[in-house]
Structures are given as C-alpha cells and as structure tokens.
C-alpha cells in the first residue's frame, strides 16, 4: 500500500528509527564513479542540516532497491531508468529487526537534479571530500565501509 511505511519503529531502549518496514537510501555514483550524490537535508527533517543519501521509509510491498529508487526520484528528480543498481548492503540494524539498506547504483544517463522540499541542496561530491561535510550521524558511521565497497566496484 502506497505510503504505509511512514512511521517510527521503537527499540526497547527507546531508540527510534524511521520506516515501519525499514528504510533504504540510494548511494548514486557519477558515471565515472568518482563522485557520490549527497542531499543536504532540510532543517525541519530528522537530523536536518546534515548531508546524507536520498532515501526514506520502505513501504510494505517494496524491496530495498524499489524504495531507494522511489525515494531518490522523489527527492532528486533522478528517474530509476537513469541508474544501474550495482549492489545492496544493510548498513544499520535495530534490536527489533528494523534495517537501513544502502543501494549502490551508477548514473547511466545524466539528468538535471531537482530537489524537493526535503532538500536544501543536492551535490555530486568527490569520494575523498565526503567526510568534509557535516554528515547525518548514521551515514557518517556507515561511510567508511561504503567507501570501501564503492572503490571495489570502481576497480571491477
């Protein structure tokens, strides 16, 4: 059902996670795989003012890739047809089974980025410059392992 994933999941310790069925984000690589698309999150959003991947809650009928591609389209204007999905990795888990899946994809058809109200900016950031940004805490934790995976994909 469309939009049925919106809502918080709460762990026994009180920690909250967005997405009743988990969440997913898109790590989009530029065509030459030297840059990653980052979203500067709107101030009103959870962890607003930080940089992260476009993404959000999974709906009950969606795979992680479906959710990441849908959210990326909503937040950046990049249609799924402009991207080639390369891999998926679970980058966060909760005690009650909630997961955040990062979907790695390569841009295959350049498109103009069109931010929605959830973004104050969208930028293609060089891989080595990602840590220079004020990152969403969960993305900052996941980035070192994601960067290793990105570099491995680029060397294939």
Predicted regions and their residues:
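Active-site-adjacent beta-strand/loop module that shapes the phosphate/pyrophosphate-binding cleft
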Residues: 32, 89-113, 123, 127-128, ...
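Acidic, metal-coordinating catalytic segment for phosphate/diphosphate chemistry
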Residues: 1-27
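A short coil-to-beta-strand element that immediately follows conserved catalytic motifs
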Residues: 79-89
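Short, charged, solvent-exposed linker or helix-capping segments at domain edges/interfaces
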Residues: 112-117, 133-137
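Conserved Nudix-box catalytic region and its N-terminal flanking loop in Nudix hydrolases
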Residues: 32-75
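Charged phosphate-binding loop/patch that engages nucleotide di/tri-phosphates or the phosphate backbone
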Residues: 138-156
